[in-house]
Structures are given as C-alpha cells and as structure tokens.
C-alpha cells in the first residue's frame, strides 16, 4: 500500500524521520523501486539501533562529530550529511521574558506572578511521566516561590488528574496540548522534560536549562 501510494502520488522524494518508515522504504527499494530519492533525518544525538539495516540515499545527522559513530555502524560515509536537527522557525528567535509571561498569562487567563521563578514541565505529546512527583518535589524545594506550568499533551486523563490533585495550589497550572511551547520556553526559567533530540534542540535554541 505504501509503495502504491508513493508511486501514484507523484512525489519527488521521501523524507523519513523515524526508523519504521525507513525500514519500509528499504524493503520497497530492495524490490526494485530505487528511482525515488529517499532521505533519513536523524532526530536523536546518536545512531539509533537497527538504522544499519536501512539502505537509503542519504542520512541527515545532527553534527559532524557523529560521522564516525554512524560510519562504525555501517552507514556509508558518503551518505552522511551533518546538517543538524531541524526545528520550527519559532524556536529560532526569542521574546523578552516579561513580555512572554504577560502573553501567557493573558492567553490562558491565569492569575500568575511574573516575579517568581517559572518552571515548565513537558513529558512529550502523549503526556507520559511522573509529572505529579516533579510538581510535589519542586514545591517542597521552592516553598511556593515558583509558578509551575505542566503540559500534559494529548493525555486528557493526566490533565484531569493534575487539575483535580492541584486545585488548591494556585501556583500549579496544568494545560493540555498546546502550540505555545516556544512562548512558554521564553517565559520559563527551567524546563523539566524527557531528553528527546528535538525538544532538547528547541530548548538549546531558547537558552532554557533542561532537567
């Protein structure tokens, strides 16, 4: 089905950002369909397992220092292109912190202090992780001298539970999936998150410390 979709779609090239489609495209190409250029874009700062099973035209990797690692895993050097991890343009410029905080407070209708330390908790688009434990420990350490924004992604159950469990804590602000991550990074002082390649790159560009 994928092969027919690609052939019938009139595409000029295929770009894979995950191992599974890269493996699928390898199988299609081994069956004789090598005329469509296929590129893999690595979104982790390491060579992931099983990437050496793929046979594509090119591999975009995060940095030239990783060329040796990928080459040792069997990826031909001539196919390695150290161009970095792509991120959205909105992460490549920053808003002044106080301006970002004002925009966030207005957008979400929060009564939130711009003078405290703001902590941002993000556990991925699916909202996995021990967010409540992070909230509890942060409050214990900071003694209410902070504002905590917890992004639950598409995990509605987590959003409901965090909202209910923290309803008496005015400094905790759970939200669901949002497109405001660039602005939230500008507004906050520290980011608690999983160490994904893309989110780490976004945070680096926004100059926000990661825990």
Q: Where do the model's predicted regions map?
A:
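Active-site and donor-binding regions of nucleotide-sugar-utilizing enzymes
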Residues: 1-74, 79, 88
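Short glycine-/small-residue-rich Rossmann-like dinucleotide-binding loops
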Residues: 19, 124, 196
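Short gly/ser/thr-rich secondary-structure transition/capping motifs
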Residues: 39-44, 172-177, 193
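A nucleotide-sugar donor-handling region in carbohydrate enzymes
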Residues: 57-125, 154-155
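Donor-nucleotide binding loops and adjacent catalytic segments primarily
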Residues: 108-188
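Short alpha-helical segment that forms part of, or immediately flanks, the ligand-binding pocket
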Residues: 182, 200-206
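Acidic donor-binding loop of glycosyltransferase active sites
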Residues: 186-196
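Structural loop-to-beta junction motif characteristic of Rossmann-like glycosyltransferase folds
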Residues: 189-190, 207-211
């Amino acid at each position: 089905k994928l092969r027919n979709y690609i052939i019938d779609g009139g595409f000029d090239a295929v770009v894979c950002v995950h191992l599974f489609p890269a493996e699928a495209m390898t199988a299609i190409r081994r069956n004789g369909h090598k005329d469509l250029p296929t590129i893999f874009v690595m979104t982790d700062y390491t060579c992931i397992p099983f990437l050496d099973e793929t046979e594509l035209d090119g591999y975009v990797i995060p940095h030239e220092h990783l060329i040796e690692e990928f080459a040792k895993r069997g990826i031909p050097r001539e196919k390695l292109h150290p161009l970095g991890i792509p991120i959205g343009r909105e992460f490549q410029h920053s808003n002044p912190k106080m301006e970002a905080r004002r925009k966030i407070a207005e957008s979400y209708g929060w009564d939130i202090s711009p003078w405290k330390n703001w902590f941002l908790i993000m556990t991925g688009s699916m909202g996995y992780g021990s967010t409540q434990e992070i909230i509890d420990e942060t409050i214990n350490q900071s003694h209410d001298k902070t504002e905590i924004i917890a992004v639950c992604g598409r995990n509605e159950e987590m959003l409901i539970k965090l909202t209910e469990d923290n309803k008496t804590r005015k400094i905790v602000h759970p939200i669901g999936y949002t497109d405001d991550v660039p602005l939230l990074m500008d507004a906050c002082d520290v980011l608690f998150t999983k160490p994904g390649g893309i989110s780490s790159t976004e945070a680096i560009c926004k100059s926000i410390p990661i825990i």
